[in-house]
Structures are given as structure tokens and as C-alpha cells.
Amino acid sequence: MKFRRMISEIMDFRNLSEDEAYSLMEMIMAGELDDIKIAAILTALAMKGETVDEITGFARAMRDRSPRVRVSGSHEVVDSCGTGGDSFRSYNISTAAAMIAAAAGVRVAKHGNRAVTGSCGGADILEAAGVNIELDAAAAARSLSDVGISFMFAPLFHRATARVAAVRRSLGFKTVFNILGPLTSPAAAGIQLLGVFDPQLVGPVAEVLRNLGTRCAMVVHGFDANLNPALDEISTVGPTLVAFLEDDEIRIDRLMPPDFGVEVGELEHLRAGSTTAENLELFMDVLRGREDTPEQKSRLDIALANAGALIYLAGLADTLPEGTETAKRTVKSGAALELLEEFVSYTRNLQS
């Protein structure tokens, strides 16, 4: 039996080929493996350590089997999605950054889920703001075309995610599925800003994106002021480890907040609230451009730095600081808040 051979190889610390990993994910998605077998596979892979080829095969299978959000010029579409699971429970930075970048003219296909480590994930915050997050592929494509932004709720697009959800909860440790979410954009976005929970994943995940045909990307992990791993985002409180992917070449760099055009902030200022209502207020303050207190300024600056990177990747700015400056002008003009209001109205009128 194929499963028995694969689990035996993994338990012997032998790596699967990309094709074998693809086949294994197909078995999971087709419901051919029960929870015990899925748990065994995920545990064995975590103990061995997943390779670039294995992650590529898993991601390719999930992409091939999920509904496709078909948009013209998908190579110019940007996805902003992190793995979650980092060591600090920050407010929802990537969703604020996506909204700001979209208001600046970037076509953003935001792919996300509910909270992993924070108290409010991208789906949670947009739903609380009034967005209809349960759009099918056709509706998401219309939203991207008409509004300039769409949200694709991962469980609606990836049956494998739903299939293994209970197993992942019972295992209680990170598995390859923590990495796969951001790698499986239903819009096949050609441009990506992808945050990872572990700095050791920065280079390998960039290699996976290259294997999957991503045109250009930044894979990032943010550190705190004491150089401790902290954020699956660009950091404004310490260094950011970045893998730049462009023209099939990968370059690793370590950047500081001024390299993004922002001042060094305080990590504690970025902490999420304890309720969805509190997190919605933090999110709205950022889109309003509020910086009356040091806490508000830190939250705004990190959103601007991440939005600026999206603007830079999309080719709407020549440098990262220019991207951040464009993001700041966008927020101060009120355009980000206006786009959210339009996004809410549009998605509520769409029938999935």
C-alpha cells in the first residue's frame, strides 16, 4: 500500500519526492486516510522536518484541487498572507496593510483564515468590520475586479484544510499545514508578501514560491529589539530577515526599520486586544491614520511598512521607503477607510 510505504520512509527520515508529496496530499484531500493515519503522517513529517520538495508537492496538490479565482492579469495580483503561529500576539497587521495597499492601487487578493495565535485573524477582523467573507470563487473574482480587493476564506477553498482541522487541534504542535496556507492562494497571485513564524523558514519558503511560479515575492520574519523571533510580518521594532524573490533569483537580507522608512517602535504597542471588538477598534484606528499616542503611532508605522512593501512589490514604488510614503499618503487622504466601506457594501450585496 502506497501509504504504508510513505509513512515507513518518513519514519526512517527519508525524504519524499515532490511527486510523492503531491500524491500523499491527494489522498488526504480525497478522504482516503482516516484521522489516525493523517496524525501519523503529520507527526512523522514534523519530526523529520519538511523539505522544499515536500512542501512544493503538497502546495501544488492543494492549488490544483481548489476552486480557482480567475482574474485577468493574475501575475500582477498581490497576496498578503502570513503563516500565523508566531511568538507574539500582534493586532492584525497584514489585513490593515492589505487594505492600505489596495487603496493605493495594488490589486490585492487577500487569502486568510481565522486566528491562529492572535485573538483575531484576518477573517475575524474583516467579518467584524462588516465584510461578507464567505464569497465563492466567482464572487471573489468580481470583488477583485470591481473593488480592487477580495478576501478568500481558506476553509471554503481548501478541503484539505477542513479535513485535517480536528487532527491539527488534537496534535497541538505546528505541522506542515501551518506553512501551506499562504502558499495556496486560490487567485494564483504572481506577487506575494509572505510572513513566516520561524526565521529558518524564510529561505526554504522562498524556494517553494519559486517552484510554484511566483513572479516576485518577499518572505519575511520580524525580530524584536533583543533579536528574538517575534513576528510573521515586517518588523518595525527590530531587524527583519527577508528573502527577495525576483526573476527566479533569491537574495537574503536583513533590514532595519529605517530601511522601510519608519522609526523604531515598541513591540508591546503592537499587542492585540483581548476581544474582537477591541481588535476591530485597533484596526480602524490604523485605517483612520491615528497616531495621537505612541501606541497608535507604532501600530500605524508597522502597517505602513508592510503596505509599503506590497506597493513596492507591485511596482508602484521604486524603493521600500517610497512604498511606505505612498502608504502614508493613502491613509492620510482617507482612501483606506473609504475602500473598507466600499468593500463592506460590495460584498454584502454579492450573492455567493
UniProtKB/Swiss-Prot annotation:
Pfam families reported for this sequence: Glycos_trans_3N (PF02885), Glycos_transf_3 (PF00591)
GO cellular component: cytosol
Cofactor(s) of this protein: Mg(2+)
Top-rank taxon: Archaea
UniProt: anthranilate 1 binding residues: 82, 113
Cofactor-binding details, from the entry: Binds 2 magnesium ions per monomer.
MF term (GO), any: anthranilate phosphoribosyltransferase activity
Gene3D superfamilies: Nucleoside phosphorylase/phosphoribosyltransferase catalytic domain, Transferase, Pyrimidine Nucleoside Phosphorylase, Chain C
Binding site for 5-phospho-alpha-D-ribose 1-diphosphate: 82, 85-86, 90, 92-95, 110-118, 122
Keyword Ribosomal protein in record: no
Biological pathway: Amino-acid biosynthesis; L-tryptophan biosynthesis; L-tryptophan from chorismate: step 2/5
Coiled-coil annotated residue ranges, if any: none
Catalytic activity: N-(5-phospho-beta-D-ribosyl)anthranilate + diphosphate = 5-phospho-alpha-D-ribose 1-diphosphate + anthranilate
Keyword annotations from UniProtKB, A to Z: Amino-acid biosynthesis, Aromatic amino acid biosynthesis, Glycosyltransferase, Magnesium, Metal-binding, Transferase, Tryptophan biosynthesis
Binding site for Mg(2+) 2: 232-233
E.C. number(s) listed in UniProt: 2.4.2.18
Binding site for anthranilate 2: 168
Root EC class: transferase
Family membership noted in the UniProt record: Belongs to the anthranilate phosphoribosyltransferase family.
Record protein name field: Anthranilate phosphoribosyltransferase
